[in-house]
Amino acid sequence: MNLSTLQPAKGAIKSGRRIGRGQGSGSGTTAGRGNKGHKARSGYTSKNFEGGQMPLHRRLPKFGFSVPNPVKIRTVNVADLEKYVEKGLLEKEITLESFKSIGIIGKKDRLKVLGTGEVSSALTVTAHYFSESAKEKIEKAGGKTVVVFRTIEEAQKMKKELFEEALLTPKVSVDEKKKAAKKLKA
């Protein structure tokens, strides 16, 4: 027996049906698809196709709208901060850039620190929001919480100020800007 002489056993391979090759073959003309219509055609039907009837997604009314650039608030627990510091992913002074570097937030995201778990080491944490319990636990362990007003992307766009100062600069409302402009004119 050689590799060149190997053959499948008799009856192991069955030739496929040749469809649409004349009426004498038994599966010619309509090729086993019945008579004409949508199901006789190639391709597929979408699951929401209702045979030409007005589909459900068009019968129901529309309301509301989707916010084009929604603000995403990512969360991280106090216990997780402790783990990240122990593993060496974060240092004792935790900034938004360090959160971004390990993939917790993106450039446009906001960050909220939640109070699940315990903290034993003194950490300086910078974030947009802190829950009451998180703030309490961090400060109880001898740490510090720094509230930031801007995202990383917004701070990078502010060319006049240093990056850290830009993050900490409170946003001025449109009304306040108008009032300031009026004062300058007067």
Curated annotation (Swiss-Prot):
InterPro entries named in the record: Ribosomal_uL15, Ribosomal_uL15/eL18, Ribosomal_uL15/eL18_sf, Ribosomal_uL15_bac-type, Ribosomal_uL15_CS
Highest taxon of the lineage: Bacteria
Any one GO molecular function term: rRNA binding
GO biological process: translation
PROSITE patterns, alphabetized: RIBOSOMAL_L15
Compositionally skewed regions (Gly residues) per UniProt: 21-31
SUPFAM superfamilies (UniProt xref): Ribosomal proteins L15p and L18e (SSF52080)
Gene Ontology CC entries for this record: cytosolic large ribosomal subunit
Signal peptide extent: none
Record region (Disordered): 1-51
Keywords assigned by UniProt, alphabetized: Ribonucleoprotein, Ribosomal protein, RNA-binding, rRNA-binding
Quaternary structure, from the entry: Part of the 50S ribosomal subunit.
Role noted for this protein: Binds to the 23S rRNA.
Sequence similarity: Belongs to the universal ribosomal protein uL15 family.
Descriptive protein name: Large ribosomal subunit protein uL15
